[in-house]
Structure formats: structure tokens, C-alpha cells
């Protein structure tokens, strides 16, 4: 991808500049789709069930945009990309990494002048556009399709090695049961029993793709990211209500993950002790080391 400057000289374009071009073309596509169909399709990013071959729903321009977005996030990614199950997980991780920045210079840097901290990892956040172009909205079911097509999609870029790992971070509870069964089936180098898979720190699946589960609790009990906050944090009140991490909590007496992430974790991040997150962050560092050994710089 090259650009012509005002003086007529050519230069290599950046990924951000190329993404801007794609976004502009897609904006026109979106407008034309609505106009052509007389508003019969007012929502541009409608997702239909095409299974693994989700690109069937895309036109040629959209397929090119999808291919670019996949490369940018999952093959030519300039930083480690971390995929999580829910929209609250990136909040937890960002706050934990920021709080523990002295222990994890590989994951965050502090700007000298402003003292602002900038993450060195990409905590992938889903939205309607990514759902449409990448078939990702978060959750173990999405990632079951993701890992099954990852190797095939990466073949389009294999003339150059991947730049960084892509990590699927999942709660170690009942949610990813089908995901675990599928990776056992598809990757012969993994343990053959689900309970053994759950005990591992992390697994390399293929190419630059890894899976990382939250560590099991004592007694090999299931865990989720919320379990790595101290009890006193989990017991903090919001508007007189208690935190309940279940999806079916009683909103009249309790509050859920969204408010916990926003009003408890984010607002108290400077005083919360995030040290229980260290095993997870340590595994991310180990994954990076493993990746470098597989793909040493030339």
C-alpha cells in the first residue's frame, strides 16, 4: 500500500491510513445499501447464521475489509491481542496491568513527561462492526468458530511470519465446556480429558494462537476473573446493593458485572490490590516468550 505525496514522491502507507480508506468505502457501502433497499435494511451490521464461512454474507469490498481487519488484529498485530468473553474483562485486565506496571514492563509503559501509562497489549473490544466483519461478539461459542478458521485465514498472510501472539482468555467455569471439548478433538497435542486441560497454565493451538484459562481455585474449583479480586472488593456496596456476578441476579438487591467494573473496579483502581491477577499476567508473559522461541526475529 503506497501513497503519493504532494511533491509526487511515493511512500509506504500505514495500517491506520489503509484502515481509514476501508472505513470510508464501507461508509459509502452502508449508505448505498440502505438507500437501494428503501430502508428495508436499516441496520447495516446484521449478522446471519453462516457458520464458519461467515464471509458468504459479505460483498467483494467487505471481504477485502474483513481480510484487512483480520490481519491487523490477529496476524500483523503490533501488540499481543487478548480476546476475552465479556466487556467487563478488559476493564479488569487494564486496571490490573496499570496497577502492577512496575512488575510488568513488558505489558505497559509509563510516559516520562505525563506519567500516563500506555498498555503494550491490545485488549480486543467487540462492537457491531467487528461482529459483522470478523464474526466476533465475545464468548466461548464465538471463539470455537474463531480457532477453527484461524489457521485457514492466516494462510493468506503466511509469506511473512505473525508478529505477536493472539490469546483467547476464558473463565475456567462451565461456559467454555464445548470450547474445551472442541480443542481436545482438533488438537492432538492437548490433554485428552477436559479436567486436565483446565489445569494447564496455557496452550499453544497453532501459528500464533493460544488459549489461557483463569487458574482453578483451591480444590480444583471453577473460577472466573472476578474471583481474583480480594473479598473486600467483592463485598463493596453500590447504591446500597451487593455485587452478584451471576447473569440472573436480582437487580432490586444486587448489581451485576457492568456496574462492578465501572463503579467498583475502575473508580477504585488506585487503591485496589490486584496482586491476585499476577498468575494470569505471568502466563501472558510466558506466552510471549513461547511465541518468540517459535518465531525468532530475523
Regions found by a protein language model. Give the residues of each.
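Acidic, divalent-metal-binding catalytic cores of TOPRIM
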Residues: 1-298
Amino acid at each position: 500500500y503506497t501513497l503519493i505525496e504532494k511533491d509526487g514522491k511515493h511512500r509506504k502507507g500505514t495500517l491506520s491510513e489503509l484502515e481509514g480508506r476501508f472505513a470510508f468505502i464501507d461508509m459509502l457501502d452502508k449508505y448505498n445499501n440502505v438507500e437501494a433497499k428503501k430502508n428495508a435494511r436499516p441496520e447495516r451490521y446484521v449478522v446471519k447464521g453462516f457458520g464458519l464461512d461467515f464471509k458468504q454474507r459479505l460483498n467483494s469490498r467487505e471481504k477485502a475489509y474483513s481480510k484487512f481487519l483480520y490481519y491487523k488484529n490477529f496476524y500483523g498485530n503490533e501488540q499481543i491481542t487478548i480476546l476475552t468473553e465479556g466487556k467487563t474483562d478488559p476493564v479488569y485486565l487494564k486496571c490490573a496491568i496499570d496497577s502492577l506496571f512496575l512488575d510488568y514492563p513488558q505489558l505497559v509503559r509509563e510516559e516520562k513527561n505525563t506519567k500516563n501509562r500506555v498498555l503494550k497489549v491490545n485488549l480486543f473490544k467487540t462492537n457491531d462492526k467487528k461482529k459483522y466483519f470478523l464474526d466476533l461478539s465475545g464468548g466461548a461459542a464465538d471463539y470455537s468458530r474463531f480457532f477453527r478458521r484461524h489457521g485457514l485465514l492466516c494462510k493468506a498472510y503466511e509469506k511473512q511470519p505473525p508478529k505477536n501472539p493472539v490469546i483467547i482468555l476464558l473463565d475456567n467455569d462451565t461456559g467454555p465446556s464445548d470450547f474445551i471439548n472442541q480443542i481436545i478433538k482438533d488438537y492432538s497435542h492437548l490433554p485428552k480429558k477436559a479436567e486436565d486441560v483446565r489445569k494447564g497454565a496455557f496452550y499453544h493451538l497453532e501459528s500464533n494462537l493460544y488459549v489461557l484459562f483463569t487458574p482453578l481455585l483451591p480444590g480444583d474449583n471453577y473460577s472466573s476473573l472476578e474471583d481474583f479480586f480480594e473479598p473486600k472488593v467483592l463485598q463493596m456496596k453500590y447504591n446500597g446493593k451487593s455485587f452478584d456476578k451471576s447473569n440472573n441476579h436480582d437487580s432490586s438487591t444486587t448489581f451485576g458485572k457492568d456496574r462492578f467494573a465501572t463503579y467498583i473496579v475502575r473508580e477504585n483502581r488506585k487503591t485496589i490490590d490486584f496482586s491476585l491477577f499476577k498468575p494470569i499476567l505471568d502466563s501472558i508473559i510466558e506466552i510471549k516468550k513461547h511465541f518468540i522461541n517459535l518465531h525468532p526475529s530475523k
